């Protein structure tokens, strides 16, 4: 395999075990960062042409330190003092409340693991884009506008996304075109160009699946979306830097590898509510009145999400891979995804599989680092685990991979 892609270094058992331990800790830290309300997504490398954050989320604050002013801190301190006083006056009630919170959270986590595991791909996502058709035509030399238009004809949401994109003046300036009020998807595809369509369609196809409007998880949605974009684009960039044929396949690989997160977060609110109702019924049947009435005060507990993501994302991604119909020409892409799901050592992977591993490592590093929570001393081990050359890290960051490079 190309040395531009991997370091080809062999490490002793002690170093390998340490790198694996650090990898598990960092992945866990990233899952907690995703759901934490304390950390917001750094906006400096977000591609607003594809993110829906401005539509559904609160006003964007570019720096985390701007979130809390000194006056707000004083107010929070006063409010905390009052809460503490009330807690002393109602200590027993708080104890019951705490136990109910833990009880519901435990039940909700078990319920989510069970129900999500049993769902079909259509149940998980509500709809599943026609990646089978896309992958069968997108990377062929015979790809043309007519073949691409089949997708916009059969997928109304994709059609609307394509039209919105080519009618966006800022986006059009990136591809050297003038914005027009286009209504014909075929003309819109022509405006984008075949190369840009093969690059962007997987992103536009998956875009409607993530629920940005859920008030419980709307703080998580921008982070999930950026993780998908980074994973997809960095996979493409690494394949490009290694001189692999059809590097744009990296976009689809990244999308398919990360979209399972969308399903988990999309279902969280409803599944938590279902679990809460089930516990209320149990308390009522057991005549536990205090616990029963305490249920009404419980809000969805996001702290269980990291465990659910950790337990299910590989299993659900296998369902995604199985849902796509692969051809003899695209089976290497399927194999790359399976290499990642099976945790095949990077040195034993195909170039696509190695690039996908490195892209995920970069995506996690980048977002944690921008929030100041990546452990710096872990960096050499983190990237050594995916055989990523040190110089590649800066090369990728210099390209601002949160934004998609387009052909003009």
Protein language model features and the residues they cover:
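Conserved alpha-helical "signature site"
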Residues: 2-255, 262-270, 301-408
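Flexible internal linker/loop segments at domain or repeat junctions
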Residues: 276-305
């Amino acid at each position: 395999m190309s040395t531009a892609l991997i370091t080809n270094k062999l490490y002793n058992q002690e170093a390998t075990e340490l790198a694996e331990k650090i990898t598990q800790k960092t992945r866990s830290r990233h899952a907690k960062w995703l759901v934490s309300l304390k950390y917001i997504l750094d906006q400096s490398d977000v591609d607003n042409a594809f993110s829906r954050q401005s539509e559904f989320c609160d006003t964007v604050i570019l720096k985390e330190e701007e979130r809390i002013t000194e006056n707000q801190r004083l107010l929070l301190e006063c409010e905390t003092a009052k809460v503490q006083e009330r807690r002393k006056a109602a200590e027993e009630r708080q104890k019951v409340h705490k136990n109910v919170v833990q009880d519901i959270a435990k039940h909700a986590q078990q319920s989510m693991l069970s129900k999500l595991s049993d769902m079909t791909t259509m149940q998980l996502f509500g709809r599943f884009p026609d990646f089978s058709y896309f992958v069968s035509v997108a990377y062929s030399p015979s790809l043309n506008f007519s073949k691409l238009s089949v997708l916009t004809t059969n997928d109304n949401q994709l059609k609307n996304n394509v039209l919105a994109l080519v009618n966006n003046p800022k986006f059009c300036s990136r591809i050297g075109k003038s914005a027009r009020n286009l209504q014909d998807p075929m003309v819109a595809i022509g405006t984008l160009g075949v190369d840009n369509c093969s690059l962007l369609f997987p992103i536009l196809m998956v875009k409607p699946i993530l629920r940005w409007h859920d008030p419980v998880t709307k703080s998580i949605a921008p982070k999930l979306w950026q993780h998908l974009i980074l994973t997809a684009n960095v996979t493409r960039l690494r394949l490009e830097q290694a001189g692999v044929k059809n590097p744009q396949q990296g976009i689809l690989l990244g999308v398919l590898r990360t979209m399972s997160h969308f399903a988990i977060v999309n279902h969280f609110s409803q599944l938590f509510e279902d679990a809460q109702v089930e516990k209320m019924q149990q308390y009522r049947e057991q005549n536990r009145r205090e616990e029963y009435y305490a249920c009404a005060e419980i809000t969805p507990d996001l702290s269980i999400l990291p465990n659910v993501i950790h337990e299910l994302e590989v299993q659900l991604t296998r369902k995604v891979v199985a849902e796509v119909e692969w051809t003899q020409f695209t089976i290497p892409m399927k194999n790359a995804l399976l290499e990642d799901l099976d945790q095949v050592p990077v040195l034993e992977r195909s170039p696509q599989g190695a690039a996908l591993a490195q892209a995920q490592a970069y995506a996690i590093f980048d977002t944690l680092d921008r929030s100041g929570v990546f452990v710096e001393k872990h960096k050499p081990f983190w990237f050594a685990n995916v055989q990523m050359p040190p110089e590649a890290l800066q090369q990728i960051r210099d390209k601002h991979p949160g934004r998609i490079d387009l052909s003009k």
